[in-house]
Swiss-Prot record:
Functional description taken from the UniProt entry: Bidirectionally degrades single-stranded DNA into large acid-insoluble oligonucleotides, which are then degraded further into small acid-soluble oligonucleotides.
GO cellular component terms, A-Z: cytoplasm; exodeoxyribonuclease VII complex
Any Gene Ontology biological process: DNA catabolic process
Protein name according to UniProt: Exodeoxyribonuclease 7 large subunit
Family classification: Belongs to the XseA family.
Family annotation (Pfam families): Exonuc_VII_L, tRNA_anti_2
EC class of the enzyme, as a word: hydrolase
NCBIfam families (alphabetical): xseA
A GO MF label: exodeoxyribonuclease VII activity
Subunit structure: Heterooligomer composed of large and small subunits.
Amino acid sequence: MEKYLSVTTLTKYLKMKFDKDPYLERVYLTGQVSNFRKRPTHQYFSLKDDHAVIQATIWSGIYQKLGFDLEEGMKINVIGRVQVYEPSGSYSIIIEKAEPDGVGALAIQFEQLKKKLTEEGLFQERFKQALPQFSKRIGVVTSRSGAVIRDIITTVSRRFPGVDILLYPTKVQGEGAAEEIARNIARANQRDDLDLLIIGRGGGSIEDLWAFNEEIVVRAIFESRLPVISSVGHETDVTLADFVADRRAATPTAAAELATPVTKLDVLTHLQNQEKRMATAVRNVLSKKQEALKKCSQSVIFRQPERLYDGYLQRLDQLQLRLKQSLRTRISDNKQLVQARTHQLVQLSPVTKIQRYQDRLGQLDKLLDSQMALVYDAKVAEAKRLSEALLMLDTSRIVARGYAIVKKEESVVDSVESLKKKDQVTLLMRDGQVELEVKDVKTKEI
């Protein structure tokens, strides 16, 4: 009886076959990129030819080291291993290395990196540094044994003897060359006594010059504090190092000439010309001063020097007169001020105040005596008048003169209106009193 396998069992069997097949552990494959969409980490796409398609995967760490970007339709050569993905029962190639297919592979990498760095702005003119006019020490990053360093030393020594050349022996092609170039550029920038840096090598194929197209080298040049001259290959060779460097030289000799724009002969010639111009300028100044001295010696002041002081003497007399007037005015003002202050002090003196108060007290004492006398006289007169009035009111005196006083209930009757018939009244007379009864009341017609 036939035994049926499950899908899982079959898939696991196929995976085991794939994993144990030595041929599938390292496959060399060429194909065209299809269904590619760049992702931030791992890349998943297809490789195809005219008759078949296989899924492909590149892990992010591998992809970052490729040196170029995948593009839709690009033909590439890859090395990888084939594996089965059990959940879907599909197989794919896990790519470990990849490069563009054909002669233009490096050109593609060059253009892609150039585009990337251009977009970042590394090649912009605003980042270029000016080369120094005079350099005391120049650093050179190149091979120890190449013709480059010999040409640079010869040219610099000829143009400006005394300039120091500091060589950083560097591997300029092959594996590890780019890292060593970048490392020596960084080392040179750590020194404070370098004025300029030249990097370069002689001519060669694009593969020979490729280290100077690596991103690590380009960024090292961009980050250099020192101005950098690039001299890589022949005049027709162009590298990314040339784009990012502050200046590009077609040959090592040209690089040395750029590094020493002013030669020793130029300096000597300039100094000689300056010496001549200074001598001419001194002669001209001396001639002008002599002419001025001659004119001065012929002037009236030198012939009659006493006239030089006429104006000053007149001015001095005027100032002396003004000074005397000013002093007299100030003395007079100060005298008046002293007198005024003296008068104020006298007025404010305690003795003066006491004297004023004593005078005022005497005046008030006299005024008080006068007022008291007046008040006394007035009071005496008033008392006399009141005494006379009291005497006039004394009943004994009234009746003594022959008058009689009528009283009703101990009250003096001064009007008939206060009486009525049958009222009992008392009539006071000089020698006694009479008790009477009112019989009739008659009002006097007025």
